[in-house]
């Protein structure tokens, strides 16, 4: 799935 900014910030 495509990551949203709210998801990739967790990296």
Curated annotation (Swiss-Prot):
Protein modification: ACE hydrolyzes Neb-ODAIF by sequentially cleaving off two C-terminal dipeptides.
Keywords: Metalloenzyme inhibitor, Metalloprotease inhibitor, Protease inhibitor
Cystine crosslinks: none
Domain of life: Eukaryota
One example GO MF annotation: peptidase inhibitor activity
Thylakoid as UniProt keyword: no
Family indicated by similarity: To the N-terminal part of insect vitellogenins.
Functional summary from the UniProt entry: Substrate for angiotensin converting enzyme (ACE) in vitro.
Record protein name field: Ovary-derived ACE interactive factor
Organism in which the protein naturally occurs: Sarcophaga bullata (Grey flesh fly)
């Amino acid at each position: 799935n495509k990551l949203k900014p709210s998801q990739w910030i967790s990296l």
